[in-house]
């Protein structure tokens, strides 16, 4: 049995529409997503337009608009995060210093451990995981700060605005239709109903982040699929207030994950200092795992019972929690083109993540800058920004620059772990030493949803929640500040009558307790969905369902993640 055997009632074509003639809102450059890629694009465009009044005038009254589905900038952003500052330095130049940026601290040293249930063996940090000179950050806080810089650069930011449909006519992207707000559970308009609008831009930048709704539709509509299918990991993260500050970055591998190839459990944990009073701890696991009883949230709770981790947390207090997927396909899963007429794909929406280095934020910033520069060049007199090929220089800059060079060097690193931890670690070492030439050629892959499922008794090892060190899913969702209305329409598409094994996969997988097993009938069970619990992590899209945009302003209210 595979998750892909039970696809949801969803067709990417339903996300594509023609613009309406009814009161469209025209902007110059329309950016979808207020994360590091979209905001870097807005900032760089503002810098370029400052010295080009004719181009600014050509873009109209709203030269740059950023829409974001979160209630405010940063509220849906989550990452580890240790940030390489190279792209932020390039973006701001002399305008901002590192000291001006909301970093939690400088990484001066780090440790990597191979874990067993009771022991932690310190091992040399792989070259790809060395972080000296980088900075620890809360991506939610960094996103808020970047939004302030974007507004100072002249961008208009529209929070609580989801992108529902991609507007396409005559083979080019014209903009985005935003989602309605204020509908009831059955789709009926409520007293405060607000219909969506058509936002028309000369060019549209998709910077939605992981599992982008419009990005996936655009890739399908324009045939941009990469050589390998994209695959994802799920990260679950907690922020703790602790009495004794942590003074270095920690990564772990091994326990509580199992190394045998039959389980396909790829991942590890991170523990980062966040100033004098807090630290962040998280677990990341590839969603190509096979065991229906695996739960990343519960693996994180299990990890915290390790003696080494328990000592770090001490008598601390959990003050933050969140979950998000991460694109892990690498070089061969990048779209074969990151542009189409009137469109560019940036950041996690395009899959620009370096898995062995555990890095994606500076690549998102870099791609946003490169997109801005390509758009600006295509807006010059005599150019037509939406003509076929006008934005091709963006692709060339991504693939030949920092992003492409880094991702190509680690092009098969994620895929070699499909043979298990020991063999994968050996192959990863060879790949690092050979700058990616070993293994030779392209190592293929399968979609996460195409993995054959197995069932074990894995869940018996998960610790019971005690409310002090270990926690259940519902209390964690509460800590995320989730604002989704109980009477909002269901934004999750799944097949609701499936074999029990399939239902158990979704129940365990979801970190927010969205799915429950209902009555059984004729060899199948009913899956009960509670969409108001959803923190929009995107895991269901990787494992057989489909996450669509809820109404703008719904979802988590991340502040420390």
Model-predicted segments: where are they?
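FAD-binding beta-loop-beta segment adjacent to the flavin cofactor pocket
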Residues: 4-5, 324-351, 355, 475-487, ...
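Extreme N-terminal leader/targeting segments of oxidoreductases
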Residues: 1-29, 44-65, 476, 481-483, ...
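Active-site-proximal substrate-binding core of FAD-dependent oxidoreductases
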Residues: 59-61, 75, 351-357, 369, ...
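Glycine-rich Rossmann-fold phosphate-binding loop(s) that bind the pyrophosphate
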Residues: 33-36, 139
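C-terminal auxiliary extensions adjacent to catalytic cores
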Residues: 417-468
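Predominantly flavin-linked oxidoreductase catalytic cores and closely associated redox partners
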Residues: 57-60, 140-145, 149-312, 370, ...
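Iron-sulfur cluster-binding cysteine motifs and their immediate structural context
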Residues: 503-560
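N-terminal FAD cofactor-binding segment of flavoenzymes
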Residues: 44-48, 60-117
